[in-house]
Design a protein with these regions (language model features):
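Residue-level signature of mid-helix packing/kink "hotspots" within the transmembrane helices
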Residues: 44-53, 138, 260-268, 352-353
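Helix-to-loop junctions at the C-terminal end of transmembrane segments
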Residues: 51-63, 267-278, 363
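Symmetry-related core transmembrane helices of the 12-TM Major Facilitator Superfamily/SLC fold
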Residues: 156-173, 372-387
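Structural signature of the two symmetry-related core transmembrane helices
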Residues: 66-80, 281-296
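Helix-breaking motifs and short loop linkers at transmembrane-helix boundaries and internal kinks
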Residues: 63, 84-89, 278, 299-301
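Cytoplasmic helix-loop-helix junction between adjacent transmembrane helices
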Residues: 96-134, 327
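Juxtamembrane intracellular "pre-TM" segments in multi-pass secondary transporters
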Residues: 1, 181-220
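Helix-loop boundary and gating motifs at the non-cytosolic
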Residues: 1-45, 218-219, 223, 227-245
């Protein structure tokens, strides 16, 4: 539960940007092209994706707690860069730093919970972890929308992020304990789920297995990437779309908060559900639901339709997000599970960068609804690929 609280603070640190930065790009820095405005998500996604990989490797080598504390230390300058940044380049640089911090902190809370709970409740643990993180994102997105409407886009919203970082660092240093030895205990009784997933693999072999060779691991990796591709679109272009339709900052803040709120709260149910019915059905259904929600955003034109769409998008993402992480934990051997999680998160958070670039280019050329429609089609295709390629019974029955 301490790690759940820490990850809520990790999510809050990210949530300080969700409502504000898309508006900051246009209203303060006068960025007209969507591709230019989305550079901060591209920078965040590349930095976080790369750091996820190293977080897994460093956690295996040095332990989980040192990586977690380092992530909080890296985050310290972010709110001040966002508050005082005189140019858009400062905002992009702040998101590089934030991406590094998020890669270290969020990845480590995932690994530590996997270490602690064992295989039978892995979905429940991932649901708790991701629910805490995205409820933190949602609550902060909503709070910063109201703060900005009263006090302006800077500095008020980012002072909340500074407080989260201070508390998260204090908790991680003073109260969090190392969990790596639990993975060693689990490894002694581990029964491989698939052939080729034995203990003695090099980092290169783990990368190729997770990314390409294993049908289940690679299916999960591509689905994670597409999921965050559409989240990058939602983060960067939804507030711009809503503002262009005449919605107030308060209403934009509500829509920006409802999506991760449903996503976060829903994972309290879907994570545990995947322990019972398996990972594959929830992943496939979740990707299809997301695609339908994105299609609603593309054709919608008012607050009511968009509210229904973001609720549906949050529900679909809740079905997928903890389930994908649990599926990685099911297949990966405890000796290299942290590395496999890091590689999955490399692909998944690389989706932020791909989504920002792809949706920005399409939006510049054809408008935001066209960009949303293309991403909806990609999301549906990803779900179909999981249905065809992923093995069916990937929840652990053998300890």
């Amino acid at each position: 539960m301490l790690l759940v609280a820490v990850n809520a603070l990790v999510g809050g640190t990210l949530g300080q940007e969700r409502t504000i930065l898309p508006l900051l790009a246009g209203q303060v820095f006068q960025l007209d092209l969507y591709t230019s405005a989305l550079t901060y998500i591209l920078a965040f996604g590349v930095a976080k994706a790369a750091t996820n990989y190293f977080a897994g490797t460093f956690s295996d080598r040095y332990g989980r707690k040192p990586v977690l504390v380092t992530g909080w230390l890296v985050a310290l300058p972010v709110p001040f860069m966002l508050i005082f940044g005189p140019s858009w380049g400062w905002i992009v640089a702040a998101n590089v730093v934030l991406g590094i911090s998020q890669g270290l902190t969020w990845s480590t809370t995932v690994m530590m919970k996997m270490d602690l709970v064992g295989p039978e409740r892995r979905g429940l643990a991932m649901g708790l972890n991701e629910a805490a993180g995205y409820l933190g994102v949602a609550g902060t997105a909503l709070a910063t929308g109201y703060i900005a409407s009263t006090y302006g886009l800077r500095p008020g919203p980012f002072l909340l992020g500074a407080a989260f970082i201070a508390v998260g660092l204090g908790l991680s240093v003073l109260t969090v304990r190392e969990t790596r030895h639990h993975a060693g205990t689990e490894a002694a009784a581990h029964v491989p789920v698939h052939s080729g997933t034995h203990a003695g693999l090099s980092s290169r072999e783990v990368f190729t297995l997770t990314s390409f060779r294993d049908r289940s691991l690679s299916s999960v990796s591509q689905a994670g990437m597409v999921n965050n591709l559409n989240d990058g679109l939602a983060w960067g272009l939804f507030p711009v779309l809503f503002a262009a339709a005449g919605l107030s900052i308060e209403r934009i803040g509500v829509l920006a908060a409802v999506y991760p709120a449903v996503w976060g709260a829903g994972q309290l149910i879907t994570g545990a559900l995947s322990d019972r019915i398996g990972r594959k059905p929830l992943i496939v259904a979740g990707m299809i639901v997301q695609a339908a929600a994105l299609a609603m955003v593309a054709v919608g034109a008012d607050f009511g339709i968009w509210l229904a769409a973001v609720i549906l998008l949050g529900a679909g993402t809740a079905m997928v997000y903890p389930t994908l992480l649990a599926a990685i934990g099911d297949v990966a051997h405890p000796h290299w599970r942290a590395r496999s999680v890091g590689i999955y998160r490399l692909w998944r958070d690389g989706g932020f960068a791909v989504g920002a670039l792809l949706s920005g280019v399409i939006a510049d050329a054809y408008g935001i609804p066209a960009a949303v429609g293309v991403v909806a089609a990609l999301t549906a295709a990803s779900g179909i690929l999981v249905a065809v390629r992923m093995r069916r019974a990937d929840h652990i029955s053998a300890g």
